[in-house]
Amino acid sequence: MTGRLLIPGLIAASVCAVFAACLLGSTPMPADRVLAAFFGGADAGDRLVIWQIRLPRALAAYLTGAALGISGAALQGLLRNPLAEPGVLGVSASASLFATFSLYYGLTALAPWALPVAAILGALAATALIALAAIRTRSVVTLILIGVGLSSFAGAAMSLLMNLAPNPFSLSDMINWMLGSVANRSFEEIGLAAPFLIAGAGILLASRRGLSALTLGEE
């Protein structure tokens, strides 16, 4: 019974966390005003704060956390290591490197989707390298070492780009990207990321039996 209630309980807790995030801000908002803003009964100011600032920010954090949790669980099964996390194979660092390139060369000024597309391409490039390595070796340790090498290379390249940043604004954008932030998010940005998150989660959930089998060993 406890196992059956665990997932519904966690979902309920996460929904409560999103609602609590809508209460908090530079000016705390009572729960009744937040609910009124959700259902259209509040004034224009409250609706603007909830629908344009706090709710997109909360949903962005929620989806990001869910994606990191799912990918981390999948990597723990794949690598048979309870400490594995999304950055262990260098995918996160490669995504950051490509995003930093787009910021360095000003590609984000050409189109608002240039930055996330660059990050996705970086992640796919690292994933392709790891997949090619996995064809040649079945050693988990080798894959982890390749991932560590990718992360180190990406980190060094990002440091070089920051040192060569053409202006303070580009440097600030690079640092903000590397640190990460859910501030100033919008539903358009969430809509851009959501299909990839949903597709990835679906693939991992469909592969959960195979990932569970891998925890038994390479044989």
Locate each region found by the language model.
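Alpha-helical transmembrane segments in inner-membrane proteins
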Residues: 1-219
